[in-house]
Amino acid sequence: MSFFDLTAPTIQGAPQPLSTYAGKVVLVVNTASECGLTPQYAGLEALWRDYRDKGLVVLGFPSNDFGGQEPGSAADIQAFCTTRFAVTFPLFEKVHTKGVGQSPVYAFLTRQHDEPKWNFHKYLVGRDGAVRASFGSTVAPDDAELRSAIDAALAT
């Protein structure tokens, strides 16, 4: 099974086959609007703008799993991301990243990598749909290690 075999509901509630992103490098991030790391939205948007024409897509999956820091509705989350951080990368419905009710996307991502321990954990998926790397919450979108891993994934 590949990441691209999965489907996830967009923030608007429509089912989105992740095969839409097949052939691209994907950065999956669990997000939250009321977290000390929430400013990473700006960095993720910059990363998306810098790399989207090279084959990277950033996917945001809001989650209320850590500290109840994403309590809003889908409409609240989308409005917050758009007005506060001018987010244009794809956002999905709020998910559980671990435990009971874990989303199929996160069940796949955590098969060979640790579950997120906090908001803004990042998984890098290669063009082949396999998870290539995982980065903790404090790894910022402009971190050299993350960008190097993205560059390497894009080169394959």
Regions found by a protein language model. Give the residues of each.
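N-terminal "domain-start" segment that seeds a small globular fold
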Residues: 1-19, 39
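Conserved helix-turn-beta segment immediately C-terminal to the redox Cys motif
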Residues: 24-25, 34, 39-62, 82-85
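Short, thiol/selenol-centered motifs that function as redox-active sites or metal-ligating centers
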Residues: 32-44, 63-66, 70-71, 129, ...
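Alpha-helical elements of Rossmann-like donor-binding domains used by nucleotide-donor carbohydrate transfer enzymes
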Residues: 43-46, 76, 104, 108, ...
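Thiol-based oxidoreductase modules, predominantly thioredoxin-like and allied folds used
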Residues: 55-72, 88-99
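Short, internal strand/loop/helix patches
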Residues: 75-119
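Thiol-/selenol-based redox modules, centered on thioredoxin-like
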Residues: 107, 111-156
